Regions:
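Mid-domain alpha/beta scaffold segments of enzyme catalytic cores
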Residues: 1-118, 122, 126, 175, ...
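Catalytic pocket-lining loop regions of alpha/beta-barrel enzymes
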Residues: 98-99, 112-188
């Protein structure tokens, strides 16, 4: 699930709705998210926050840790352009967050970039699963920043990093999902 601190939730939901071209059905706040989970009979929702700017990772993770209770289990986030992102991975683990969410389209990188190898290695060492927005995204419709074949590249170098390939492995790239990642025991 995606939710935001109260002070930015309305603005964030409007921006996401406008970019995607369809309405949102949540206020995007912690309180409304918990209400929806309860009303729908969902025991636990996994919060997947995103630091869209390098300067946001600490504050986003502080908020994620604050709401990491009851029916919300939180992941943390890092931004690969923040020079402290490896230290932030250690902090994510110490905060009790359950994994890491990255969104290459919003964060402006491609999964296959060599500069990310320390990230993958550290996540594997810390046993932090990584959730990735995969395939198409309306924010950058001409570029696919995270494709199933990129996960093969990552696992050749860091075979034991656990990856949750969101959107069934990649929006609008289903054939590549079957070809490249089905059956990999470290990709969910």
């Amino acid at each position: 699930i995606h939710a935001f601190p109260d002070g930015i939730a309305e603005r964030a939901m409007k921006k996401l709705s406008d970019t995607a071209g369809f309405p949102h059905y949540s206020l995007g706040t912690e309180e409304d998210t918990r209400r929806i989970l309860t009303d729908c009979g969902i025991d636990i929702g996994v919060l997947l926050p995103i630091a869209t700017k390098p300067s946001q990772q600490t504050s986003v993770n502080n908020w994620a840790a604050k709401v990491n209770k009851g029916n919300i289990v939180s992941f943390g986030t890092v931004h690969p352009d923040n020079t402290e992102y490896l230290d932030e991975l250690d902090r994510i683990k110490a905060l009790g967050l359950k994994g890491v969410k990255i969104h290459p389209d919003y964060q402006g990188f491609f999964l296959f970039e060599e500069r990310l190898m320390p990230f993958w290695k550290r996540c594997a060492e810390l046993k932090l699963p990584v959730t990735i927005h995969m395939g198409y995204d309306p924010v950058s419709p001409e570029n696919r920043h995270a494709m199933p074949q990129d996960l093969v590249f990552i696992h050749e170098k860091v075979p034991n990093v656990d990856i949750i390939a969101a959107h069934m492995g990649g929006i609008f790239c289903w054939e590549a999902v079957f070809r490249y990642i089905c059956g990999d025991r470290h990709i969910w």
